[in-house]
UniProtKB/Swiss-Prot annotation:
Range of residues in the leader sequence: 1-18
GO biological process, alphabetically ordered: lipoprotein localization to outer membrane; lipoprotein transport
Cell compartments where the protein resides: Periplasm
Main location: periplasm
Transmembrane segments: none
Keyword Cell inner membrane among UniProt keywords: no
Organism listed in the record: Photobacterium profundum (strain SS9)
Keyword Hydrolase: no
Job description of the protein: Participates in the translocation of lipoproteins from the inner membrane to the outer membrane. Only forms a complex with a lipoprotein if the residue after the N-terminal Cys is not an aspartate (The Asp acts as a targeting signal to indicate that the lipoprotein should stay in the inner membrane).
UniProt-recorded name of the protein: Outer-membrane lipoprotein carrier protein
Amino acid sequence: MIGLFLAAPLVLSSAVWANPQQELSSRLSLVNAFSANFDQKVVSPEGDVLVEGKGDVTIKRPNLFRWNTVTPDENLLVSDGKTLWYYSPFIEQVTAMWLKDATEQTPFVLLTRNSASDWDNYNVAQTSDTFTLTPKDTTSTMGKFVVTVAKTGEVRNFSVVEQDGQRSNFKFRQFSKQVPKANIFTFTPPKGVELDDQRN
């Protein structure tokens, strides 16, 4: 009888975590708009910190986001729902690409879409509040994508792990569920900058 009681938590746990893909999607769907500040660390395969940075991010699902890096180098990533704009003031260049083509370069796009068709391309594993996504396509150049999402839908941190083991870690602070204004997801290239338009 004691054995049955000991086994019960294992059965319940198995049921709760039966489908990590659905659990991730369900949690993300609880918060369809948020803003936060972030801290970034790029860590080498050997564990050395290569780069540290800070910035802020604003998201409104589906497909709208503004990712503003303040340090070490100022740059801006904006999605207006169709086009992904990347602006680097230092080199005075803007790159434009279709958002649907940007997942390989910017895995964070997955969180802004929360699309079942996206998740189907990954093996999703769950450990508590942390989800690890590994591409099913063995020819993909993308490594693992690790994200921590609370049961309330709050995205707390995420990491992009390259195939060589280098890791980019992002930790969110001052998480707010306030719905952002629509105009912050628009972008017009400043006059005088070079435009690399990859949408053709």
